[in-house]
Amino acid sequence: MLEQMHEALQRLRQEQPVVLNITNYVSMDFLANCFLALGASPVMSVSDLELEELIGLSSAVYINIGTLDHLFIQRAYRAVDLAVRQSKPVIFDPAGSGATKIRTEVSHHILSHATIIRGNASEILSFGDVPAKTRGMDSANATHDAKDIAVALASECLCGCAVAVTGSEDFITDGKRHATVELGDPLMSRITGMGCSLTGVLAAFRSVIEDSFEATRLGVEYFSLCGMLARERCEGPGLFKAYFLDELYAADFDRMRRYHNQ
């Protein structure tokens, strides 16, 4: 597994794929820095006027609805339509789906066109008939609560999509293959934008790995291992954020091996 991660990182740093981000304003800076630390080239666009050209240049399109308004919704819908026409993978983070009616409606609209969907348990549950508990952007459900919905979502997808339910443990599926990841550190949940940045990492990995399930699995594991290494170096969230970027960049697989082989 670590060898596959290493190969993916090498490809990212050799190819430096462009990833177009239609994302929220809260985590935009941290997200862009995560892409750069990996070796990818992020574009953080807020203009409809350049969408078609930028999608043509991009290897993947990442959409996150964390700070949506009517202009953002129009831009996201158009980006999805253009990405589908140009056969570009759409990586989707349904931030807050289930918390409000509009977020849930927008998420359902984008869902059917997504190549990878990454959300917490409550967000993924909002796509099924099971009542979800939310605390704004945070989940009040455990990962195992959303596994059946995740499998059903991935199974219904016609384009080989993958679904990741993330939390204290992570579950990844494409409807046929399943993986559970029990890595990471609780301090990661104390920093805004970590989930958004995880989805961005998945977009970067999908830019160089055609198989959506493998891209998602490797991306989740790499992100989680970097969190564990960053936690070794600090006690609180302020320094953790800086050390986490350092670990994304360092790709220290020798240190990762201690956790990955447990």
UniProtKB/Swiss-Prot annotation:
- Give the record's keywords alphabetically: ATP-binding, Kinase, Magnesium, Metal-binding, Nucleotide-binding, Thiamine biosynthesis, Transferase
The entry's substrate-binding residues are M44, G193
The Gene Ontology biological process terms listed for this entry are:
thiamine biosynthetic process; thiamine diphosphate biosynthetic process
The reaction(s) annotated as catalysed by this protein in its Swiss-Prot or TrEMBL entry are: 5-(2-hydroxyethyl)-4-methylthiazole + ATP = 4-methyl-5-(2-phosphooxyethyl)-thiazole + ADP + H(+)
Please tell me whether the keyword ATP-binding is annotated for this protein: yes
Its Enzyme Commission number(s) read 2.7.1.50
MF terms in GO:
ATP binding; hydroxyethylthiazole kinase activity; magnesium ion binding
- Reading the lineage from the top rank, the first entry is Bacteria
Residues noted as binding ATP in the record, renumbered to the chain: R118, T166
Keyword Nucleotide-binding in the entry? The reply is yes
Cofactor requirement: Mg(2+)
Instruction: Name the pathway it acts in.
Output: Cofactor biosynthesis; thiamine diphosphate biosynthesis; 4-methyl-5-(2-phosphoethyl)-thiazole from 5-(2-hydroxyethyl)-4-methylthiazole: step 1/1
Protein's job: Catalyzes the phosphorylation of the hydroxyl group of 4-methyl-5-beta-hydroxyethylthiazole (THZ).
What's this protein's family per the entry? Belongs to the Thz kinase family.
> Protein name, please?
Hydroxyethylthiazole kinase
Q: Which organism is it from?
A: Chlamydia felis (strain Fe/C-56) (Chlamydophila felis)
